[in-house]
Amino acid sequence: MKNIVLIGSTGSIGRQTLEVIGSLPDRFKVVGLGSGKNWRLMAEQIRVFRPSAVAMAGEREIMNLKELLAGSYCPELGWGRTGMESLASMPEADLVVVAVTGFAGIYPTIAAIQAGKDVALANKETLVAAGHLVMKMAERHRAAILPVDSEHSAVWQCLCGRNSGEVEKIILTASGGPFREMCLEKLEKVTVDMALKHPNWNMGSKITIDSATLMNKGLEVIEAKWLFGLNYSQIEVVIHPQSIVHSAVEFLDGSVIAQMGLPDMRLPIQYALTYPERLPGSFPKLKLASLQGLTFEEPDTRRFPCLSLAFEAGLAGGTMPAVLNAANEVAVEFFLKGLLPFLGIPSVVRSVMEKHEMASDPGLEEIIEADRWARNMGVKVIRDLFN
């Protein structure tokens, strides 16, 4: 029995993680749950999984949760950054799943690593902003970082313990999003509802917008650099509209190993939870004979410049990836509120990056400060350019 702490339990990845855990009740026990503000769903999760500890974003959510749970089982409760960090470092936890979206995921991730816990990481921003610190910290505390993203899970499975010195390059696939074939003139008129309709994946709103701009793939490029110890010249992105090949690895001898499966996040989630074992899954399986065809093409960075911006930020290093991430989070937030056009997202990110005075070898506090600066600058840029 493996004891699981899940932070981000009410989000898309969190809910699917609990679905996987629920399908393997004799293998996993949920000992801790953390989430943002959805206290009603958290109450349901507590009733089903009966964790010993729970944390939420704020005290108000905890008070509402207490009231809803009155007269029934109530775990130990905490809130805010301190509550999440306590949850991530629970002594009884064997694996901490970090499924929080955004920069906030860095705090429980670091707390789990410092407590020597293995981390199943579904939060891109942690490695994007602080990959150089987090991977060194994980090595020092002997904590494993297990990728949950389908693309990184695919690369991990293709490598299968091989030395990165045998790798020529990795190939990250992207669906291309809902606007893969849309011209620039039409992209200028993209609405929020249009952008939230991903053709293949069922995801939260922020990552769905990132997929539409290709920023999601850009963040994954930076994440892959740290997860697998590669140079950016060894990371290639190709558009694969069917989302069946989740990524591939090309080795020095020219052979390519790819990982395939249906576009279902429960598959990489289950692999991260059960690793190093593979257990029977209760989810739909890929039938090769039913496939009509698999196609691949180069990404168009003229229409989708966020991918190029991510490579630029990664190559610059230092605080620049944190600035890229923070500016993007702000831009996506304003887009989702209808306060920024779709093509304004890369414009804001580029403008904030150009204004940033980069620190080349930042510590955690410098990264946090760069994140704060970029958010403030992002808001200023939006108000100056689009209002």
Curated annotation (Swiss-Prot):
Transmembrane segments: none annotated. The keyword Manganese applies. Its EC number is 1.1.1.267. GO terms for biological process: isopentenyl diphosphate biosynthetic process, methylerythritol 4-phosphate pathway involved in terpenoid biosynthetic process. It comes from the Bacteria. Its cofactor is Mg(2+); Mn(2+). NCBIfam families: Dxr (TIGR00243), PRK12464.1 (NF009114). This is 1-deoxy-D-xylulose 5-phosphate reductoisomerase. The gene is dxr.
